Amino acid sequence: MLRFAPSPTGDMHIGNLRAAIFNYIVAKQQHKPFLIRIEDTDKERNIEGKDREILEILKLMGISWDKLVYQSHNIDYHREMAEKLLKENKAFYCYASAEFLEREKEKAKNEKRPFRYLDEWATLEKDKNHAPVVRLKAPNHAVSFNDAIKKEVKFEPDELDSFVLLRQDKSPTYNFACACDDLLYEISLIIRGEDHVSNTPKQILIQQALGLNDPIVYAHLPIILDETSGKKMSKRDEASSVKWLLNQGFLPVAIGNYLITIGNKVPKEVFSLDEAIEWFSLENLSSSPAHFNLKYLKHLNHEHLKLLDDEKLLELTLIKDKNLLGLLRLFIEECGTLLELKEKISLFLEPKDIVKTYENEDFKERCLALFNALKSMDFQAYKDFESFKKEAMRLSQLKGKDFFKPLRILLTGNSHGVELPLIFPYIQSHHQEVLRLKA
């Protein structure tokens, strides 16, 4: 079984979605069940409704799952596993207070050495502290694993101490809950971000202590770097939020296409998730960081907009008139996102706001003069744009840029765009909607 294990503590990050996509693809390729595990044990950081938001995004991306679990439902199991380790002398109670440990950390900082927990501290405050934590005994050997992307990763004994499994309130730590659940659901491969590399040896040690016979295979994805700063994309970067990208009008299929492409060798530029299942391989992923490129994402989104069938295009743009399909196709040629496309069609059909956009009084006068001329014309009487244009120029007494710029704004709501002769048939059939001014 493979899994994707998000925390409902904020917007879904593109790095998390990338991991979800890859786990889903490999599960499909290997004909294994796919589990979604909501890691909600950190009650203080959980945000109401974020779990549902994550699941909705996965559905939009075309990702389905065979099983959905909430980690908090397994707390009794986590405590049971901790008790097992205590009985087998693989874990121990630690009575050292948070204040004591903080002093030791400060001492290590002042002495410019890494802080490392010492097992001898476990009973120092036993008489004063009646709510101990449970720690796993530190290993006396190195922990290594062969990462499917990063190759061999090794942690020496002095890099690992006796770490906490259960907190004072008996709640499991992230690493303990994660390791227990991966064992419980027989997870065979974990694809996740490289920010989890330091968690992996701890989870391996927990699973070894609990008697895992078949080691889990790990694949840690390189981080995604911001295109301008070159630094890791954090949750503060709006483009790192999948929700933000969707709200900006990026299609789910295009986002998926992009996240599969970056740092990867792909056989074609534009593809769907189902197509990627046919050829995706972890071996083709680079071990170097990937750079986020919003311009290229827009390009891919533009290509996917062109691939939308008529029914889906009308649905996404909220247009009910099928006669406007041809116009939508023309507008797509100039749009990188669905939001841009919806704005273009809205400007075309809505009353034109010449005052708000163009405050120059001379320009306003020319617009009004041309508007009055156009209102007197029978749009259906002209066989083509050329004959329509000549009559409009004659009636308005305008020419050159004094004519063409106001004309484009009055007919499309935009000062530039698709050639007017191409969209003239749609102007003719919808002139009563098109030729309106905002009050």
From Swiss-Prot:
GO terms for biological process: glutamyl-tRNA aminoacylation. It is an enzyme of class 6 (ligase). One of its GO terms (cellular component) is cytosol. A motif ('KMSKS' region) lies at residues 232-236. A motif ('HIGH' region) lies at residues 6-16. It is found in: Cytoplasm. Keywords: Aminoacyl-tRNA synthetase, ATP-binding, Cytoplasm, Ligase, Nucleotide-binding, Protein biosynthesis. It catalyses: tRNA(Glu) + L-glutamate + ATP = L-glutamyl-tRNA(Glu) + AMP + diphosphate. Monomer. This is Glutamate--tRNA ligase 2. It comes from Helicobacter pylori (strain P12). The lineage of its organism: Bacteria, Pseudomonadati, Campylobacterota, Epsilonproteobacteria, Campylobacterales. The gene is gltX2.
